[in-house]
Every structure is written in structure tokens, then in C-alpha cells.
Amino acid sequence: MVNQPTKKTEVFLSLGSNIDPEKNLKYACRELKKAFGNIQISSVYRNKPIGFEGNDFLNMVVKVKSSFNPNEMLDFLGRLESATGRNVGTGAFDSRSLDIDMLLYGNLVHQEKPFQVPRIDIELYSFVICPLAEIEPDGIHPISGKTFKDLWESFNQEEHPLNKVSLKV
């Protein structure tokens, strides 16, 4: 009997940190490479925190191809966050050693707990849509049907300004 290759799904992840961000983003990318092999990485962007006072965040988007189902992916990402000292009990608007959100899981549309894809953050925050449009400009949002490039170009970029930073991860 021949083993069938496991089908892999394209998964897009948003990574952010404002506590030792250079170290934590490098750690996350290293672990993602170990787990998934070849990954695609956006530029890194600096932005002010939204909804609270704190250090600037560094944010990026990473594309992986995974045989994990969505729940397995969430468990894996939670372990990466915990390894950097992230306290999962912190509020939505708080400093973070590492925050990894699953933005897209293939073309899956799932809007119930424990996860939502596509994640609404794609259309709300420049630090999500800008790097996503950078690495997948012609990708199609599974609900709106718009390309990520079009979503970024129509985004109010003055409301959430970003600065690209030079960081090798």
C-alpha cells in the first residue's frame, strides 16, 4: 500500500510583540521553520499600540503550509506564545511577549469559537493587512471576495500608520 501524501493547507499567521520583540519574533520564525519547513515571511512593521499605552509593536505576517487541522494549529501557536512568557490571561489591549493569530486557514470560513477565520483583524488593522498584502497581494479574502492588495489600497493608512523596519528574522 502506498502512503498518500498528507494534504497541506496554506495558513497565514499574524505575529506581533512589544516585549523584547526582536528576540520573540526571531524565536517564533525559527520555530515555525522547524515545524513547517519553508515559510514565507513579510517585512517587519513598527506601530504604536492600539487601545492602550505601551511600547511600540513589531508585527509581521507569515505563510506556512501545514497538515495541522485548525485546532491543532491553535494549540501549536499557543505553545509558542507560552514559551516566550506570554500570559494568556492578559486582556485584548495589553503588552505581549508574542501574539500569534491565525488569519486564514485555506479558504475556510468559520466564525464560531474557538477560532474565527478569516480573522476580522484583516480588515481592521494596518499591521495585519499591509504585511498580508505584501506576501499575498492577489490572495482573495474568503468573505469579501476582494484581493488583499485591494483591501490594503482602500485602507485608511493614516489612521494606523506603520513604519517598515530592517529586521532579519
Protein language model features and the residues they cover:
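N-terminal beta1-alpha1 ligand-phosphate binding loop
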Residues: 2-35, 42-48
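Short, surface-exposed acidic-centric catalytic microdomains
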Residues: 27-73
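Short N-terminal secondary-structure initiator segments
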Residues: 1-6, 67-77
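Flexible, gly/pro- and Lys/Arg-enriched active-site loops
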Residues: 47-57, 71-74, 79-169
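Short beta-strand-to-loop capping motifs
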Residues: 15-17, 62-68, 104-107
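Amphipathic, positively biased hydrophobic alpha-helical segments used for protein targeting
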Residues: 25-27, 62, 117, 156
